[in-house]
UniProtKB/Swiss-Prot annotation:
Belongs to the Mediator complex subunit 8 family. The elongin BC complex binding domain is also known as BC-box with the consensus [APST]-L-x(3)-C-x(3)-[AILV]. It is found in: Nucleus. The gene is MED8. Residues 156-176, 193-268 are annotated as: Disordered. Residues 1-28, 133-163 form a coiled coil. This is Mediator of RNA polymerase II transcription subunit 8. It comes from Homo sapiens. Its main location: nucleus. GO terms for molecular function: RNA polymerase II cis-regulatory region sequence-specific DNA binding; transcription coregulator activity; ubiquitin protein ligase activity. Residues 200-209 have a biased composition (Gly residues).
Length: 268
């Protein structure tokens, strides 16, 4: 009998030690959440959760150890119930239980859940028993498939975000070509004067281009208007026909007129 009592006391001491460590970890984590929420990081929260999980696993191992007696076989009977304040009880419970009265005992010494919770548990057990094994297996497979797809999508998004953050965005254009194109459109940089072959006749070997021809034509019109007003309309019609018909070539008659106009004394 004494051996069992000593074993029970040793098991209780080990259990109290594990519970005290777990309580300190919970207190520090709650204090961190309340006071350091502004600079709290997710890795530190995960570390706190990992510490709590490890302590809970250790507590379960202590309870399931072969040398630990079954505490469910131990009966606790309150010997004294008093509505008065108990200082020793306050110190043992760290101020959480000031009195040990008829109102407190059912909450702290209850070995069964509340009647409402027990009723809900029975209802859930009944609903679970109604589902057949095949239907339950199908639902489990469907749920596992949905969870797997969701986890795959989340992992894909994480990989894409990490890869996108590690490497810079690939450039899809060449800045040199873009600047050259803008300069050519805006300022004509890099563009050359080009005219089709055969646009100049034998009498226009020294003339630079169509712009000079048009300028000479306008000068010819001015001379003819001053000297022979009756010839203004035919000359204008000839120029218009040349411009409308073949913009790159001028008729031979107009070339002769331009040539004679260039010899006029007013064109010096």
């Amino acid at each position: 009998m004494q051996r069992e009592e000593k074993q029970l006391e040793a098991s209780l001491d080990a259990l109290l030690s594990q519970v005290a460590d777990l309580k300190n970890s919970l207190g520090s984590f709650i204090c961190k959440l309340e006071n350091e929420y502004g600079r709290l990081t997710w890795p530190s929260v995960l570390d706190s959760f990992a510490l709590l999980s490890g302590q809970l696993n250790t507590l379960n191992k202590v309870l399931k150890h072969e040398k630990t007696p079954l505490f469910r076989n131990q009966v606790i009977i309150p010997l004294v119930l008093s509505p008065d304040r108990d200082e020793d009880l306050m110190r043992q419970t760290e101020g959480r239980v000031p009195v040990f009265s008829h109102e407190v005992v059912p909450d702290h010494l209850r070995t069964k859940p509340d009647p409402e919770v027990e009723e809900q548990e029975k209802q859930l057990t009944t609903d679970a028993a109604r589902i057949g094994a095949d239907a339950a297996q199908k639902q489990i497979q469907s749920l596992n498939k949905m969870c797997s797809n969701l986890l795959e999508k989340i992992s894909k998004e994480e990989r894409e975000s990490e890869s996108g953050g590690l490497r810079p965005n690939k450039q899809t254009f060449n800045p040199t070509d873009t600047n050259a194109l803008v300069a050519a459109v805006a300022f004509g940089k890099g563009l050359s004067n080009w005219r089709p072959s055969g646009s100049s006749g034998p009498g226009q070997a020294g003339q630079p281009g169509a712009g000079t021809i048009l300028a000479g034509t306008s000068g010819l019109q001015q001379v003819q208007m001053a000297g022979a007003p009756s010839q203004q309309q035919p000359m204008l019609s000839g120029v218009q026909m040349a411009q409308a018909g073949q913009p790159g070539k001028m008729p031979s008659g107009i070339k002769t007129n331009i040539k004679s106009a260039s010899m006029h004394p007013y064109q010096r």
